[in-house]
């Protein structure tokens, strides 16, 4: 059991990729499970993870999450320690995996992790976005639209 000073995450977000919605235009979102070892789960429950530079890709017909950083759990024995940036297998249905792999290969799309979280049952999940990369002018256009919507909402709020 955790001590009073520790705050463990039983459900909710652990990590968020804030750059994903800025650098990519997200076409579709997918929820996938993760295969993790015990020390990875314990480390995630303490809220320590980084998915900013990570991506998902195919490997022998299955999907893996690459470059996600889950640090070592400090209380673990070194024999049970895991590699912080090892590829982690994603759990999706076979048909969905085939569809996503074909979208990556044919359409030049990317699978970007948006959130890493624990669901209500306590299972580690990752929300992936099937995305296309944005060019610099697309990013500027998206920023202009966001500011315009913010200004529009402010005017409507102040008048009402």
Curated annotation (Swiss-Prot):
<dbReference type="InterPro" id="IPR023620">
    <property type="entry name" value="SmpB"/>
</dbReference>
<dbReference type="Pfam" id="PF01668">
    <property type="entry name" value="SmpB"/>
</dbReference>
<comment type="similarity">
    <text>Belongs to the SmpB family.</text>
</comment>
<keyword id="KW-0963">Cytoplasm</keyword>
<protein>
    <recommendedName>
        <fullName>SsrA-binding protein</fullName>
    </recommendedName>
</protein>
<dbReference type="InterPro" id="IPR000037">
    <property type="entry name" value="SsrA-bd_prot"/>
</dbReference>
<keyword id="KW-0694">RNA-binding</keyword>
<comment type="function">
    <text>Required for rescue of stalled ribosomes mediated by trans-translation. Binds to transfer-messenger RNA (tmRNA), required for stable association of tmRNA with ribosomes. tmRNA and SmpB together mimic tRNA shape, replacing the anticodon stem-loop with SmpB. tmRNA is encoded by the ssrA gene; the 2 termini fold to resemble tRNA(Ala) and it encodes a 'tag peptide', a short internal open reading frame. During trans-translation Ala-aminoacylated tmRNA acts like a tRNA, entering the A-site of stalled ribosomes, displacing the stalled mRNA.</text>
</comment>
<dbReference type="GO" id="GO:0070929">
    <property type="term" value="P:trans-translation"/>
</dbReference>
<dbReference type="GO" id="GO:0005829">
    <property type="term" value="C:cytosol"/>
</dbReference>
<dbReference type="GO" id="GO:0003723">
    <property type="term" value="F:RNA binding"/>
</dbReference>
<dbReference type="InterPro" id="IPR020081">
    <property type="entry name" value="SsrA-bd_prot_CS"/>
</dbReference>
């Amino acid at each position: 059991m955790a001590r009073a000073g520790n705050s463990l995450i039983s459900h909710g977000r652990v990590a968020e990729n804030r750059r994903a919605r800025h650098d990519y235009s997200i076409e579709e979102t997918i929820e996938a499970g993760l295969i993790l070892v015990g020390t990875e789960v314990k480390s995630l429950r303490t809220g320590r993870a980084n998915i900013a530079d990570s991506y998902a890709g195919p490997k022998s017909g299955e999907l893996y999450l690459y470059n996600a950083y889950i640090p070592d759990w400090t209380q673990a024995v070194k024999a049970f320690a895991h590699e912080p940036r090892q590829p982690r297998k994603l759990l999706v249905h076979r048909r969905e995996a085939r569809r996503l792999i074909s979208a990556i290969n044919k359409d030049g799309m990317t699978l970007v992790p948006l959130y890493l979280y624990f669901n209500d049952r306590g299972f580690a999940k990752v929300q992936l976005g099937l995305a296309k990369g944005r060019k610099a002018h697309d990013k500027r256009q998206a920023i202009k639209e966001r500011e315009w919507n913010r200004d529009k909402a402010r005017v409507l709020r102040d008048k009402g």
